[in-house]
Amino acid sequence: MIAHEFPIHYIEPVFRPPSEAHSLILPVTNGCSWNRCGFCEMYTQPQKKFRARDEAEVLEEIRRCGERLIVKRVFLADGDALVLPTRRLLVVLEAIRRHLPEVERVSSSYCLPRNLRRKSVDELRELADAGLRMAYVGAESGDDEVLARVNKGETYASTLDALEKLGEAGISRSVMILNGLGGMTLSAQHADNSARLMNAAQPEYLSTLVVSFPTGEQRFRAGFADFEALDRRALFVEVERLLQGLELEDTVFRSDHASNYLVLKGELGADKARLLAEVRQAIEQPQHAALRQEWQRGL
């Protein structure tokens, strides 16, 4: 190995949440085990075909990182690290503890509820005890009609079950909702039922992202032919409706992903009134709101 090479081999593109900007990205899988969601283009390239990475290769990369890097946080990639058997995940987590003793938090990538539900609460507790502190879950919507239209392969009930399992196991949950996913026709029910799902789950973290199609809408419209995209104002109205419906006790809320026009940050429920006021200003007086321009959205 050339001395200046980074200790980890990546198959591009590699994705991470905004909050993992300073984490070591450690791929334990390549691609997504489902990869059928109509809205998602992240893992559609041929080189991102799903597979579990070789265990020995991953362990060697962890060892090399321990020799060269000081690491505080680790993010397990790619599309859904928790699809791996619990035994394999425990081996990886143990290696992180051994070779990267400064690590304070290990997070798992965009977990599919279907794969979380295959693990028992006891298995998830084992992972938590071994150092897994957070799981990112792309709920996308709490509305069954929207989920079916976009071929998510999940329902309100299946997503709630997965989130409750994680919570019972002591793993923090960071949940993503896709602003605009239901289009104009399903916008209201998308917002209402997403709020209902979050109220039932009470996740530790919640974020909204704007649905977007950098390479075109053909894949998406295969299952949602009458989709009518929300304009910027309608996106804000939908976020406002979502926030109005949320009854959260202690959840960190963020809309700081590159796709968002309006960046929102606060605690729910403490900051609910302030967040709603910021959204209302974006609706009524966009010229006075700190909105991102199209070129700033990085899509």
Predicted regions located by residue number:
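Canonical Radical SAM [4Fe-4S] cluster-binding loop centered on the CxxxCxxC motif
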Residues: E12-E57
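Auxiliary Fe-S-binding modules of radical SAM enzymes
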Residues: M1-E20, R196-L299
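Catalytic cores of alpha/beta
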Residues: K119-E123, G182-A200
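Conserved strand-turn element in the central/C-terminal portion of the radical SAM core barrel
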Residues: R114, G142-V146, L166-H190, L209-G216, ...
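Hydrophobic faces of well-ordered beta-strands that scaffold small-molecule active sites
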Residues: L24-L26, V74, R105-S109, A135-V137, ...
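A short acidic, helix-capping loop that chelates divalent metal ions and anchors anionic groups
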Residues: K48, D144-R149, E217-Q218, L262-L264
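Conserved, mostly hydrophobic/aromatic
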Residues: C32, C40, V58, L76, ...
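Conserved SAM/AdoMet-binding glycine-rich loop
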Residues: C65-E168, E247
